[in-house]
């Protein structure tokens, strides 16, 4: 028997290994009879459908998530006037911070996301009126 000290991800382990001597190849083991298949688990209940987002007022425009990610910060609030190109919020996707900007001069009608919230592509984030 040989002893080794192995380090994995910074943790040291003492390992004992049996030494195998060269010998004639062992006969193939006999096949064991197949076990009966395990019963399948009941399917998980379907998740409840997400609540529909509130309708957008006539003449308003929504700024939608261009990609899935996490909202790092929201730079605007309802009632705030914004100019074209002004940062509305910061969306982190694939470890990159993406500034989501106002597409035109407008007033923020509603902010539908908050910091640390996860969004999917196409989710409404800000409503501009």
UniProtKB/Swiss-Prot annotation:
<keyword id="KW-1278">Translocase</keyword>
<feature type="domain" description="Biotinyl-binding">
    <location>
        <begin position="51"/>
        <end position="129"/>
    </location>
</feature>
<dbReference type="InterPro" id="IPR011053">
    <property type="entry name" value="Single_hybrid_motif"/>
</dbReference>
<keyword id="KW-1003">Cell membrane</keyword>
<dbReference type="GO" id="GO:0005886">
    <property type="term" value="C:plasma membrane"/>
</dbReference>
<keyword id="KW-0739">Sodium transport</keyword>
<keyword id="KW-0915">Sodium</keyword>
<comment type="function">
    <text>Biotin-containing subunit of the sodium ion pump methylmalonyl-CoA decarboxylase, which converts the chemical energy of a decarboxylation reaction into an electrochemical gradient of Na(+) ions across the cytoplasmic membrane, thereby creating a sodium ion motive force that is used for ATP synthesis. Can also convert malonyl-CoA into acetyl-CoA.</text>
</comment>
<keyword id="KW-0092">Biotin</keyword>
<dbReference type="Pfam" id="PF00364">
    <property type="entry name" value="Biotin_lipoyl"/>
</dbReference>
<feature type="compositionally biased region" description="Low complexity">
    <location>
        <begin position="49"/>
        <end position="58"/>
    </location>
</feature>
<feature type="compositionally biased region" description="Low complexity">
    <location>
        <begin position="24"/>
        <end position="39"/>
    </location>
</feature>
<feature type="region of interest" description="Disordered">
    <location>
        <begin position="24"/>
        <end position="58"/>
    </location>
</feature>
<protein>
    <recommendedName>
        <fullName>Methylmalonyl-CoA decarboxylase subunit gamma</fullName>
        <ecNumber>7.2.4.3</ecNumber>
    </recommendedName>
</protein>
<dbReference type="GO" id="GO:0006814">
    <property type="term" value="P:sodium ion transport"/>
</dbReference>
<feature type="modified residue" description="N6-biotinyllysine">
    <location>
        <position position="95"/>
    </location>
</feature>
<keyword id="KW-0813">Transport</keyword>
<keyword id="KW-0406">Ion transport</keyword>
<dbReference type="InterPro" id="IPR001882">
    <property type="entry name" value="Biotin_BS"/>
</dbReference>
<dbReference type="InterPro" id="IPR000089">
    <property type="entry name" value="Biotin_lipoyl"/>
</dbReference>
<dbReference type="InterPro" id="IPR050709">
    <property type="entry name" value="Biotin_Carboxyl_Carrier/Decarb"/>
</dbReference>
<keyword id="KW-0472">Membrane</keyword>
<comment type="subunit">
    <text>The methylmalonyl-CoA decarboxylase is composed of five subunits: the carboxyltransferase alpha subunit (MmdA), the tunnel beta subunit (MmdB), the biotin-containing gamma subunit (MmdC), and the delta (MmdD) and epsilon (MmdE) subunits.</text>
</comment>
């Amino acid at each position: 028997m040989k002893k080794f000290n192995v380090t994995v991800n910074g943790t040291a382990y003492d390992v004992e290994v049996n030494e195998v001597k060269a010998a004639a190849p062992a006969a193939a083991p006999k096949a064991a009879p197949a076990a009966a298949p395990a019963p399948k688990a009941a399917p998980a209940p379907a998740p409840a459908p997400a609540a529909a987002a509130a309708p957008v007022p006539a003449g308003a425009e929504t700024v939608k998530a261009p990609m899935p990610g996490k909202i790092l910060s929201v730079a605007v609030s309802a009632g705030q006037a914004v100019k074209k190109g002004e940062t509305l919020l910061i969306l982190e996707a694939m470890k990159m911070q993406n500034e989501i900007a106002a597409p035109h001069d407008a007033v923020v009608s509603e902010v539908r996301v908050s910091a640390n919230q996860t969004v999917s592509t196409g989710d409404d984030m800000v409503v501009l009126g």
